[in-house]
Amino acid sequence: MRIIGGSFKGIKIFEAFDKNTRPLRDLVKESILNILEYSKDSKINFNNSLILDLFSGTGSFGLECISRGAAKVYFFENYNQSIEILNKNIKKLKCENKARVFNQNAFNFFENKELKNKKLDLIFLDPPYKEENIKVILENIAKLKLLKENGLIVLHRHKKTKDDFGKNYTINRSARYGISKIIFLKKIN
């Protein structure tokens, strides 16, 4: 696994090799990032952005965001081996001042006081494929008003997962890659 773009482009990062993790494939990651950087309807300016990476695993997506100029990425992961690898990756890239890692279940992210009053540009959700109840997380994001006016939520799921995003979001764009689907959500104003 490697960083695809930005200031860390080409640097190999550590990854997990066990049954408890499902790394974000480079093809899918690159497609998401290209949409975020170049599309008209789903564009994010990574420079000085604030990003929340829930179910972050070893951090490849959030680290890509830092490589492209994000001011801070908040990583939430509760699997100890993934956290260990994520911290090794952060250290390898020397981006400790731009990364904040929480050993916390992503479903409880809203309890974290460090996110209070933050306005995020992008929230990336990459839950285990068997996890279907993302609506709870989306409701908490809306309740806390975490997204900036033009902020986006990107959701990586299994293509057969039923979608229920609640009343606060609309699908801005979606795509399928093999058994994965990517959904870009915008809040309804």
What are these regions (language model features)?
Residues 1-189:
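Class I S-adenosyl-L-methionine-dependent methyltransferase catalytic core
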